[in-house]
């Protein structure tokens, strides 16, 4: 069996989905997305979409996730320390346009993503 190595100029990277990493599901003007209404499931417990968010009865994984919203600087530093050169992320629409009916975007949401992009450029 031969060993395969990556070339020295190989670009390592990471990717995340906003609803799986950000948390802060109701912070700074963000309103719930369908992912925020999706409950935790298990092998014997199917996930549910609840019309009303009921935190007394269900756990919602997207509500905290890995809390990238509050820890993106540390997370980006960890990725840089690991030598990652690429980062793909999605943007949560309900952080920018909370209900989808706004004529102007949510400034706090825009600022959050701008801050991430500035941190990535360091």
Q: What label would you give each PLM region?
A:
Residues 1-122:
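Non-catalytic accessory regions flanking glycosidase/transglycosidase catalytic cores in CAZymes
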